[in-house]
Structures are given as C-alpha cells and as structure tokens.
UniProtKB/Swiss-Prot annotation:
UniProt keywords, alphabetically: Acetylation, Cell projection, Endosome, Golgi apparatus, Lipid-binding, Membrane, Phosphoprotein, Protein transport, Transport
Residues with PTM N6-acetyllysine: K237
Species the sequence originates in: Rattus norvegicus (Rat)
Coiled-coil boundaries: none
SMART domains: PX (SM00312)
Protein name: Sorting nexin-1
Domain remarks in the Swiss-Prot or TrEMBL record: The BAR domain is able to sense membrane curvature upon dimerization. Membrane remodeling seems to implicate insertion of a N-terminal amphipathic helix (AH) in the membrane.
Record localization: Endosome membrane; Golgi apparatus, trans-Golgi network membrane; Early endosome membrane; Cell projection, Lamellipodium
Residue ranges of the region described as Disordered: 1-142
InterPro entries: AH/BAR_dom_sf, PX_dom, PX_dom_sf, PX_SNX1, SNX1_BAR, Sorting_nexin_N, Vps5_C
Positions carrying Phosphothreonine: T41, T48
Length: 522
C-alpha cells in the first residue's frame, strides 16, 4: 500500500523486479519517471486505478508494473488493435505473479484481467436484494403439503348439533409424524385456528388468510331442518370454503411453521374454541375493538416516507371496491342461471305433455325428443350455475376478505409508526423536564429524570426498529399476496372458461342430434 508520507518518490515505492523478468521488461516497468510535483497524485492513481481511466486527455506518463508492448500509448488508454488492456489494479496485492498474468494474457486475448479485491472493496457493503428477489428465493422452497376436507357429518340433534369435517393431510415434510393422516374438525375449530394465528402474526404485519364467514341462517337450517337439497348445498359451499382457507394457511411458509397449525392438522382432539360465536361476549368485544380501531385510524395522520406504501394502499382499496361490484354482478348471474335452469325444466315438462297428446306421430315423437333435449339443457344450466358460483363468485368472495386483511396489515404498520412517534414526543417532554430541573437546581429529582430519559430513549430505538421490521414484512407479504392472487385468478379463470366451452359444445351436440327429428316431421 502507498505510504502516507509526501516525500517518497514513485521509484522508491516500486517493488523489486520479479524472477525471470527480462531486461526489456524491467526497463519498461521502471524506465518512465513521473513528473516532479506529481509523485503523490500519480502514486495514488496507480494503486486505485481511478485517475488513469477517467482522464484520457492527461499527457502525464504513468508507471506500469507489468511489461507492455511497444505500440502502447503512455496516457493510460490503449488501442484494442495493438495490445491487450492494462490492469492497474493488479499491483494492489502480491498474490498475482507476473508469469500467471502473462499466461492469462496469452490464453485470454481481448479480456480484461480480473484483479483480487482490495481491502476497500472487500469492506464495502453488499447491495441488499430486492423484495422481489427475496420472494423468488422463498418460492424456491416448495412445500409438499396438500390438505383436503371431505365427509361433512352432522353430529347431535337440535340446536346443540354441529357438523364435523374430515381433514386429510398428505405431505413429505419431516416435521409431521407420517406422510398421510386425517382428523375430525368442526367449524369453530377453524375459527379458533384463525384467532390464534391472527393474534400472533397480524401485529407483525403478516397476512393471515381469513376463514369463511359465519352463516346463522344456513347452520340453523342444517341443525333443525331435514336433509334436503338446500342443506346439502350449504354444507358443500362451506366445505369448499374451508378447504381453500386451510390450503392458503399451509401454503404460507410462516404459518406452516406455527405449532398451532401442526397441532390442528395432527392432534386427534382439540380443546373447544371459545369466543368464536357471533353473539358471545368475546364476539361483541371484538366488534367494539374493530369500531375503536376504525375511529383511531381516522385520527392518525401519517407522514409517509415511502411512496410505495401510499400507492399500494390506494391500489388495494380501489381493487376491493371493484371486486365487491363484480361479486354482486356474478351473484346476480348465478341466480339468473338457476332461474334459467328451473324455467328450462318447466319448459321440458310442458313439451312432454304436449307430445303425449299429439295425434301426429312424427310431431309427437319430435316434441318428445325436444323435451328430452331441454331436460339435458336444464342440467347444463344447473352445472354452469354451480361453476359460476364455485369458480368465480367464491374466488371473488375470498379475495374481498383477503384484501380486507391486507388493509389491516397497512393499518398495523400505521399503528406501529404512531407508537414510535408518541414515544419520541414523550422523550422530548422528558428532556424538557430535565432541563427545567437543571435550571431550578433540583438534584434530588434529576437522577430520576435521567433514568426516565434513558428508558424512553431505548423505547424510541426499539419502536423505530419495530416500524422498520413491520415495513419490511408488509412489503414482502404484499408482494407474495399479489403473486398468489395472479396465479389463483389465472387457474380459476382457465377452469371457468373450460366449463363454458364444454357447456357450449354439449349444447351444440344436443341440437345437432335433434335436427334430423325436426326435419322428419311430415
């Protein structure tokens, strides 16, 4: 390394000639002398390699530590046709020998030598990976775990009855006791799992997938009513919603590592979840807390330092409004499709009755065939109504609830910021109080004031770290959520279009088969 003394000349700082170095090379390495008065500057340029590359117009001669060809220029810039580019970093370390350098120049023409990193370059901070890169690294870990919910079973009678679902897990992860296992869970167990996960992870900025909403009317029909089509339809909708909810839970890497999730999937019997009923004391308290948080959120005016969070929150709010409108339209479509199926069935019955009373044999047969076609079309309309609901309406409903959780993550970050600001304000008051005590010359209270200042300084530091940590988590969670949403919508839309295509193909096939019967009418 270059010494700090300004009186040393460049020739005194040159290293001794390398073994095997011919006289011409030695002369080329040490023959040129720097101009007077520029020894310090040129010495620094040689070792850092900055000035020689950035000042091509300078006529000053530079001292090279390696042999160069005769056709090279002396201003630090060399023509590519005449010689290979010089490396001025190579003298920063003694590990590079001349022989190896010359061999590299012979075997790799036209390429710049790669120097060993200097101490300054080694100590320089590495660039932090972006959140997208972190997310891609996270997605490289494939979680081989699939859950399925089947066999809804009504247990008990009357209002004390409940429905138990079979939760089957298939996995190759070593954290579980076996590769496949099954347990029985009721709806309140799913709600209890969400409450536990939300209590632990939501305050840190994580997006905990929400369970399906409660339905007092639907469950009342199941409890006190008979097993009819409406009860079976309600249970199927809830089963599918619970399966999607649980699959989102286990797909989240943080949630999967939670012991409550593993206990939910493996343990035969769980303690009864309390506070999950809508009209219970705990439920009413949660409603009150939500209302209080909504009011407090309106009073917080956050000075956003990162424009990304402000723009992303606006996107989430706008998307939630659009999804709500689209969901309302899709629900109307489902109802119209069901009405169409019902009216098509009535139309088929009327055609069958008309065909049975017709005297013309060909016309009677054609009407009977048309009635059969309409019955098949009624089945197509019913199947498509179910596809409209399960593939489209339920998807929109899920993401409306998920976007509400995303907004809650932004709100939690805002609350963390407000706590940090409140601590800073309190610290400022403590310091002002200490100044007044010093001015009033009250040493008996001064030590207590200093202790309080120390305590609040540590709190401010901790709250600032909490805010930085939750900001990082929220950004990463939103990025992950958007990728999962895109993949989810793509899969569901493709399936939905396939069902529409299949329905139209079947419809065309039915009409093509009926056309000869219509032409045979005489």
């Amino acid at each position: 390394m270059a010494s700090g003394g300004g009186g040393c000349s460049a020739s005194e700082r040159l290293p001794p000639p390398f073994p095997g170095m011919d006289p011409e090379s030695e002369g080329a390495a040490g023959g040129s002398e720097p101009e007077a008065g520029d020894s310090d500057t040129e010495g620094e340029d040689i070792f850092t390699g900055a000035a020689a590359a950035s000042k091509p117009q300078s006529p000053k001669k530079t001292t090279s530590l390696f042999p160069i060809k005769n056709g090279s220029k002396e201003n630090g810039i060399h023509e590519e046709q005449d010689q290979e580019p010089q490396d001025l970093f190579a003298d920063a370390t003694v590990e590079l020998s001349l022989d190896s350098t010359q061999n590299n120049q012979k075997t790799m023409p036209g390429k710049t030598l790669i120097p060993h990193p200097t101490q300054e370059a080694t100590n320089s901070p590495k660039p932090q990976p972006s959140y997208e890169e972190l997310e891609e690294e996270e997605q490289e870990d494939q979680f081989d775990l699939t859950v399925g919910i089947t066999d809804p079973e009504k247990i008990g009678d009357g209002m004390n009855a409940y429905v138990a679902y079979k939760v089957t897990t298939q996995t190759s992860l070593p954290m579980f006791r076996s590769r496949q296992f099954a347990v029985k869970r009721r709806f309140s167990d799913f709600l209890g799992l969400y409450e536990k996960l939300s209590e632990k992870h939501s305050q840190n900025g994580f997006i905990v997938p929400p369970p399906p909403e409660k339905s007092l009317i639907g469950m009342t029909k199941v409890k006190v009513g008979k097993e009819d089509s409406s009860s079976a339809e309600f249970l199927e909708k809830r089963r599918a919603a619970l399966e999607r909810y649980l699959q989102r839970i286990v797909n989240h890497p943080t949630m999967l590592q939670d012991p409550d999730v593993r206990e939910f999937l493996e343990k035969e019997e769980l303690p009864r979840a309390v506070g999950t009923q809508a009209l219970s004391g705990a439920g009413l308290l949660k409603m009150f807390n939500k209302a209080t948080d909504a009011v407090s959120k309106m009073t917080i005016k956050m000075n956003e330092s990162d424009i990304w969070f402000e723009e992303k929150l606006q996107e989430v709010e706008c998307e939630e409004q659009r999804l709500r409108k689209l969901h309302a339209v899709v629900e109307t479509l489902v109802n119209h499709r069901k009405e169409l199926a019902l009216n098509t069935a009535l139309f088929a019955k009327s055609l069958a009755m008309l065909g049975s009373s017709e005297d013309n044999t060909a016309l009677s047969r054609a009407l009977s065939q048309l009635a059969e076609v309409e019955e098949k079309i009624e089945q197509l309309h019913q199947e498509q109504a179910n596809n409209d609901f399960f593939l489209l309406a339920e998807l929109l409903s899920d993401y409306i609830r998920l976007l509400a959780i995303v907004r809650a993550a932004f709100d939690q970050r805002m609350k963390t910021w407000q706590r940090w600001q409140d601590a800073q304000a309190t610290l400022q008051k403590k310091r002002e109080s200490e100044a007044r005590l010093l001015w009033a010359n009250k040493p008996d209270k001064l030590q207590q004031a200093k202790d309080e200042i120390t305590e609040w300084e540590s709190r401010v530091t901790q709250y600032e770290r909490d805010f930085e940590r939750i900001s990082t988590v929220v950004r990463k969670e939103v990025t992950r959520f958007e990728k999962e949403k895109s993949k989810d919508f793509k899969n569901h839309v493709i399936k939905y279009l396939e069902t529409l295509l299949h329905s139209q193909q079947q419809l065309a096939k039915y009409w093509e088969a009926f056309l000869p019967e219509a032409r045979a009418i005489s």
